[in-house]
Design a protein with these regions (language model features):
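Hot-dog-fold acyl-thioester-processing enzymes
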Residues: 1-53, 114-129
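Short structured motifs
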Residues: 55-61
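HotDog/MaoC-like acyl-thioester-processing domains
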Residues: 64-129
Length: 129
Protein backbone atom coordinates (compact mmCIF):
# COMPACT_ATOMS: atom_id res chain seq x y z
CA UNK A 1 0.00 0.00 0.00
CA UNK A 2 2.87 2.39 0.67
CA UNK A 3 3.95 2.26 -2.98
CA UNK A 4 0.46 2.97 -4.25
CA UNK A 5 -0.13 5.75 -1.70
CA UNK A 6 3.02 7.50 -2.94
CA UNK A 7 1.97 6.94 -6.59
CA UNK A 8 4.87 4.62 -7.24
CA UNK A 9 3.33 2.50 -9.98
CA UNK A 10 6.42 0.35 -10.54
CA UNK A 11 5.12 -3.20 -10.44
CA UNK A 12 8.03 -4.53 -8.38
CA UNK A 13 6.42 -2.82 -5.37
CA UNK A 14 2.88 -4.19 -5.75
CA UNK A 15 2.83 -7.02 -8.35
CA UNK A 16 4.27 -10.14 -6.73
CA UNK A 17 4.55 -12.16 -9.94
CA UNK A 18 6.34 -9.32 -11.71
CA UNK A 19 8.75 -8.85 -8.80
CA UNK A 20 9.61 -12.56 -8.70
CA UNK A 21 9.72 -13.31 -12.43
CA UNK A 22 11.13 -10.07 -13.83
CA UNK A 23 13.34 -8.86 -10.97
CA UNK A 24 14.44 -12.16 -9.45
CA UNK A 25 13.48 -11.25 -5.89
CA UNK A 26 11.41 -13.34 -3.49
CA UNK A 27 8.45 -10.92 -3.28
CA UNK A 28 7.40 -7.30 -3.62
CA UNK A 29 9.36 -4.90 -1.40
CA UNK A 30 8.90 -1.50 0.21
CA UNK A 31 9.79 1.57 -1.84
CA UNK A 32 11.91 4.63 -1.13
CA UNK A 33 9.14 6.94 0.21
CA UNK A 34 7.97 4.14 2.51
CA UNK A 35 11.50 3.79 3.93
CA UNK A 36 11.61 7.56 4.50
CA UNK A 37 8.25 7.47 6.27
CA UNK A 38 9.37 4.69 8.63
CA UNK A 39 12.45 6.66 9.68
CA UNK A 40 10.53 9.91 10.08
CA UNK A 41 7.96 8.15 12.27
CA UNK A 42 10.68 6.48 14.35
CA UNK A 43 12.40 9.83 15.00
CA UNK A 44 9.25 11.82 15.77
CA UNK A 45 7.83 9.11 18.03
CA UNK A 46 11.08 9.32 19.99
CA UNK A 47 11.33 13.13 20.16
CA UNK A 48 7.64 13.81 20.75
CA UNK A 49 5.46 16.44 19.07
CA UNK A 50 7.98 19.29 19.40
CA UNK A 51 10.73 17.36 17.63
CA UNK A 52 11.19 18.73 14.10
CA UNK A 53 13.08 16.82 11.44
CA UNK A 54 15.55 19.06 9.66
CA UNK A 55 17.43 16.69 7.34
CA UNK A 56 17.52 13.03 6.54
CA UNK A 57 19.45 10.84 4.14
CA UNK A 58 19.40 7.08 3.90
CA UNK A 59 20.84 4.18 1.96
CA UNK A 60 18.87 1.06 1.13
CA UNK A 61 21.28 -1.89 1.27
CA UNK A 62 18.80 -4.71 0.81
CA UNK A 63 15.04 -4.94 0.21
CA UNK A 64 12.48 -5.33 2.97
CA UNK A 65 9.79 -7.84 1.99
CA UNK A 66 6.29 -8.49 3.34
CA UNK A 67 6.55 -10.55 6.52
CA UNK A 68 10.09 -9.39 7.32
CA UNK A 69 10.50 -8.25 10.91
CA UNK A 70 12.04 -4.79 10.85
CA UNK A 71 14.12 -3.87 13.89
CA UNK A 72 14.84 -0.17 14.34
CA UNK A 73 17.89 1.11 16.16
CA UNK A 74 19.47 4.48 16.66
CA UNK A 75 21.98 6.52 18.56
CA UNK A 76 22.66 10.19 19.07
CA UNK A 77 26.02 10.93 17.45
CA UNK A 78 26.14 14.67 18.16
CA UNK A 79 24.33 17.36 20.16
CA UNK A 80 24.73 20.97 19.08
CA UNK A 81 23.13 24.37 19.65
CA UNK A 82 23.39 26.66 16.63
CA UNK A 83 23.87 30.44 16.57
CA UNK A 84 20.08 30.95 16.54
CA UNK A 85 19.74 28.92 19.76
CA UNK A 86 18.22 25.84 18.14
CA UNK A 87 19.19 22.51 19.76
CA UNK A 88 20.13 19.87 17.18
CA UNK A 89 20.63 16.14 17.50
CA UNK A 90 22.48 14.21 14.80
CA UNK A 91 21.24 10.63 14.69
CA UNK A 92 22.59 7.39 13.21
CA UNK A 93 19.66 5.06 12.53
CA UNK A 94 19.11 1.65 10.98
CA UNK A 95 16.41 -0.78 9.96
CA UNK A 96 17.69 -4.34 10.31
CA UNK A 97 16.16 -7.58 9.06
CA UNK A 98 17.48 -10.90 10.34
CA UNK A 99 20.43 -9.14 11.97
CA UNK A 100 21.55 -7.35 8.78
CA UNK A 101 21.19 -3.62 8.18
CA UNK A 102 18.63 -3.26 5.38
CA UNK A 103 18.61 0.55 5.44
CA UNK A 104 20.95 2.96 7.21
CA UNK A 105 20.02 6.57 7.87
CA UNK A 106 21.51 9.80 9.16
CA UNK A 107 19.05 12.37 10.44
CA UNK A 108 19.22 15.82 12.01
CA UNK A 109 16.37 16.73 14.32
CA UNK A 110 15.66 19.86 16.34
CA UNK A 111 14.35 19.50 19.87
CA UNK A 112 13.33 22.13 22.42
CA UNK A 113 16.36 23.42 24.31
CA UNK A 114 14.12 24.24 27.31
CA UNK A 115 10.43 24.19 28.28
CA UNK A 116 9.74 27.53 26.54
CA UNK A 117 11.34 26.56 23.21
CA UNK A 118 9.46 25.09 20.24
CA UNK A 119 11.41 24.26 17.05
CA UNK A 120 8.17 24.45 15.03
CA UNK A 121 8.02 28.20 15.69
CA UNK A 122 11.44 28.79 14.09
CA UNK A 123 11.42 30.40 10.65
CA UNK A 124 13.78 32.04 8.18
CA UNK A 125 17.16 32.81 9.75
CA UNK A 126 16.18 30.96 12.95
CA UNK A 127 15.70 27.66 11.06
CA UNK A 128 18.92 26.35 9.53
CA UNK A 129 18.92 22.56 9.41
Amino acid sequence: LGALASRDWRPLHHDREFAINRNGVKDIFINTPNNAAWFERYVTDWTGPKGRLGRMKFRMNQPVFPGDEMVFSGRVSRIDVDEAGCCWLDLDLAISVEGKVATSCQARVAIPRDAADNPWQRKNEHWKP
